């Protein structure tokens, strides 16, 4: 029973690895070697050229061009959100204090009693 189970697991893993190794991505490179290549091209023998190529490489994400305008706007939004948060906290505090005052004023002479023992 164990031999059958282990052989099934081995064949399943072998099948999975073979499918992953032959799986092609959108760019035509195998899925497992998509990132950093093990053996890079030999055209970058000079270190300075390699660094310049890496600096000029286009990445998948886009860098925002209007960061000078976006930062002050974000700062203003942050300040407004902080003011709104403070107002919300103040309103919550006033509501809870009003509710607590209402509870205490409605039963000022009541004492907590358990069976025949009152505190």
From Swiss-Prot:
GO BP annotations, alphabetical order = blood vessel diameter maintenance; regulation of blood pressure
Chief location of this protein within or outside the cell = secreted
Keywords of this protein's UniProt record, alphabetized? Cleavage on pair of basic residues, Disulfide bond, Hormone, Secreted, Signal
Q: Which residues form the signal peptide?
A: 1-28
Q: Which Gene Ontology cellular component terms are annotated?
A: extracellular region
* Residues cleaved off as propeptide: 29-109
Look up the domain of life of the source: Eukaryota
Molecular function GO labels: G protein-coupled receptor binding; hormone activity
Q: Where in the cell is it found?
A: Secreted
The chain's disulfide connectivity reads 113-118
Q: Which family does it belong to?
A: Belongs to the urotensin-2 family.
Its biological purpose is as follows: Potent vasoconstrictor.
- List the protein's name: Urotensin-2B
């Amino acid at each position: 029973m164990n031999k059958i189970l282990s052989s099934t697991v081995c064949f399943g893993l072998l099948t999975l690895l073979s499918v992953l190794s032959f799986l092609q991505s959108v760019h035509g490179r195998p899925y497992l070697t998509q990132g950093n290549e093990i053996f890079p091209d030999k055209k970058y023998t000079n270190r300075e050229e390699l660094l310049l190529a890496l600096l000029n490489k286009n990445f998948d994400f886009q860098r925002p061009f209007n960061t000078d305008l976006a930062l002050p706007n974000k700062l203003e939004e942050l300040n407004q959100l902080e003011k709104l948060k403070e107002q919300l906290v103040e309103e919550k505090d006033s509501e809870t204090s009003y509710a607590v005052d209402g509870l205490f004023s409605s039963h000022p002479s009541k004492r907590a009693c358990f069976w025949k023992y009152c505190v």
